[in-house]
Design a protein with these regions (language model features):
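Short terminal alpha-helical segments
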Residues: 1-30, 82-83
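Short, charged, amphipathic alpha-helical segments
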Residues: 31-39
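Amphipathic alpha-helical coiled-coil segments
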Residues: 43-54
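Extended, non-membrane alpha-helical segments enriched in charged/polar residues
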Residues: 20, 39-42
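Amphipathic alpha-helical binding modules
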Residues: 54-88
Length: 88
């Protein structure tokens, strides 16, 4: 599986996780910001289509989420993969 294929697969997986987190916020089961989650979801979707975007969500996560949040860690890792994929 190529780097781009791995990135795309992980992106789709994380979009599903972010959507599930938005649902948890709506149900009162999560205290994350719905606005932040929606921004992240939009950027993830854009990242599938366009290489080289300047994405803001890693800064959002680093600045305001718990450093050990597993979803946050996965999202920041995906941003790093995106940088690598965008170089090609």
């Amino acid at each position: 599986m190529s780097l781009e294929e791995k990135f795309y697969k992980k992106n789709v997986e994380l979009q599903n996780k972010v959507s599930a987190e938005i649902q948890k916020v709506n149900e009162g089961l999560s205290e994350k910001s719905i606005a932040q989650l929606q921004t992240i979801l939009k950027e993830l979707d854009s990242m599938k289509e366009v290489k080289g975007l300047i994405i803001s969500y890693p800064r959002i996560i680093i600045d305001s989420w718990d450093y050990s949040d597993s979803l946050g860690l996965e999202l920041v890792e995906l941003a790093e993969q995106y940088k690598k994929v965008s170089k090609y």
